[in-house]
Amino acid sequence: MSAGKGLLLVICLLFLPLKSAMALNCYFGTSGGAVEKSEAIQPFAVPGNAKPGDKIWESDDIKIPVYCDNNTNGNFESEHVYAWVNPYPGVQDRYYQLGVTYNGVDYDASLGKSRIDTNQCIDSKNIDIYTPEQIIAMGWQNKICSGDPANIHMSRTFLARMRLYVKIREMPPHDYQSTLSDYIVVQFDGAGSVNEDPTAQNLKYHITGLENIRVLDCSVNFSISPETQVIDFGKFNLLDIRRHTMSKTFSIKTTKSQNDQCTDGFKVSSSFYTEETLVEEDKALLIGNGLKLRLLDENASPYTFNKYAEYADFTSDMLVYEKTYTAELSSIPGTPIEAGPFDTVVLFKINYN
């Protein structure tokens, strides 16, 4: 009898994690949508001066519409949706470290399997058998996402914003080609664990094309004018900024390394990156005080923030490239302007191609 009880106990333990892992379904965009999505990495390059820990490639902002439902928790508890980063950490590359920037924080395989709370809460489908009055009578309001039995959420649709990146573990040889062509960087799942069942309805996001990374024997250096790297609009009154925009110029000078070891040709793409709220198809940054900022090229066309575009071509004999930009400050129609000092941070980022 004791052996039979022992066997029964082992079976229960084996099935408990499976129940937890299968608590949620998540799809791309809508119920029953795709559960496999991919981002193809365009061929890019590792600069010759890269050091371990350097981020050598980064994607544009990726905005993933996620739909989740099917909380089957038998204890009637609600459950949060988690973005599991690096869900299958056993698959790695010797030289390249993959990762995700989620809500401004970097998560990579050096951290192991990481779970990120999306703050999207889904109520148990089992609680639907009770009326709001019965839920209140049992004191189960704390089991519900909203705390209100009349406001139950059996599903959630939200937008997950992230960036994919590649870091250097150690500098690869000049002719190295990665064998890691397809890698799952994030899976949307429940709190318990990653559901590894290949038939599971849990949205996975892959990156592909890692075999197209090449290693350069060259790099570039940057200098920004003004040297303080601060665009100062000075003092102005509210009436002035209501009437017209204010502009300041700055420039970025890029110099290709000039030595006997530098033999490769390459291109550089760039992005103006911000964590602030964007409007106008991501071409204007809200400063938070009733003003907005745009960055314009030499033809007065606005740049799209958080998106890479070709910046300089060093495949020819060109060694130095300089470009001038305009920072344009303006008011937001119909929005009060707060007087006082303000600042915002915009990063200039590059990828080698």
Curated annotation (Swiss-Prot):
SUPFAM superfamilies: Bacterial adhesins. One of its GO terms (cellular component) is pilus. Keywords: Signal. Coiled coil: none annotated. InterPro entries: Adhesion_dom_fimbrial_sf (IPR036937), Adhesion_dom_sf (IPR008966). Residues 1-23 form the signal peptide. The keyword Iron-sulfur does not apply. It comes from the Bacteria. GO terms for biological process: cell adhesion. To E.coli YqiI. May be involved in a fimbrial system chaperoned by YbgP and exported by YbgQ. This is Uncharacterized protein YbgO. It comes from Escherichia coli (strain K12).
